[in-house]
Amino acid sequence: MKKNLTLFMSGLFAIGLLAFVPKNSPQEPWKVPDAAKNKANPVKSDAESLANGKALYNQHCKSCHGTKGKGDGPKASTLDTDCGDFTKPAFKNQTDGSLFYKTSEGRKDMPAYKKKIPDANDIWAIVNYMRTF
């Protein structure tokens, strides 16, 4: 009887510890090819581009990345990976080409938007809008 109680309590303790394990697993860095990193954004960041980028971001990105790009959208908590925070230096220090590549190609929970948004200029407009966070 005492052995069964000890096993039961050990099991409960182990389950309780799971509550402290972070949901989002650490991610390996994106492997962005040099050619993609060095690609220049052909879409000027002007009012028209930003309006287009915002509309597309709201349609395709906001549910995970959040209204202000902090990675806190309503779907973010259901993902196995971290959405990232577009307001932090780690994001802001990336090239436009890197952001375009990541948005286009995706990985794991991040969809490859080149399939959903086939016009590359629209993805560049999203990059321009992401730069406003």
Model region roles, listed by residue range:
Residues 34-40, 78-85, 107:
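Short glycine/proline- and charge-enriched loop/turn segments
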Residues 21-25, 81-84, 102-133:
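Axial heme c-ligation environment in periplasmic c-type cytochrome domains
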Residues 1-4:
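Positively charged n-region of N-terminal signal peptides that target proteins for export
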